[in-house]
Amino acid sequence: VSSVHPAHTVSLVKDSKALRNIYRNRIAHLDNTFGMFTANIRLKPGLLPYVNKNIYVHRADADLWNVNTLKTESVLVNYSVPEPYSSTAVNIDLLSPMSWAEVKKWVDFPVGRRGEDYVAFKQEKTEECIRLVEHRLPELRGAVERVFTSTPLSYQSYISSAEGSAF
């Protein structure tokens, strides 16, 4: 079990008979999947009912079989389990497919030093996600207390995911 990209995991296991070279080569040459934009939202207490399931929200014109990662067309809403006996949510994650191309221009900048344009970009992506999800959860916008975001750059920086792939 590993929390880093499979190609990186395989490269960490040296001289093992359990991993043959043909397997190593296959894993190393697989195409990467798209990455994810994630908005982790801390909610104001008592405002958004907890739902014990994921909710998928798609634009009416979204092609679910051919994902366009350059536009915010689909968002997964994931509720964190609240305190026992609470009927309201404390935290949700909004996840949307995202292309490496959208964040590639910041790849040479270290974490925390990607500039105001990167911060503005993440705020706009968050707004796009909230705007789409509002059609299903109209009370969401008023319930937002704080937002933390991650992009494919975050996944590359923290879990060695090639091009921020969600693998």
Which ranges hold each PLM region?
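Hydrophobic, well-ordered secondary-structure elements that form the walls
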Residues: V1, I41, L94, V133
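Generic solvent-exposed, charged/amphipathic alpha-helical segments
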Residues: T126-E134
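Charged, low-complexity, helix-prone segments enriched in Lys/Glu/Asp/Gln
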Residues: I27, Y118-K125, Y155, I159
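Conserved FAD/dinucleotide-binding core of flavoprotein oxidoreductases
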Residues: A7-V13, S86-E127
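Flavin (FAD/FMN)-binding glycine-rich loop and adjacent Rossmann-like elements that form
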Residues: W65-L70, S80, A89, L95-A101, ...
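A glycine-rich dinucleotide-binding beta-alpha-beta segment and adjacent secondary-structure elements
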Residues: H135-F167
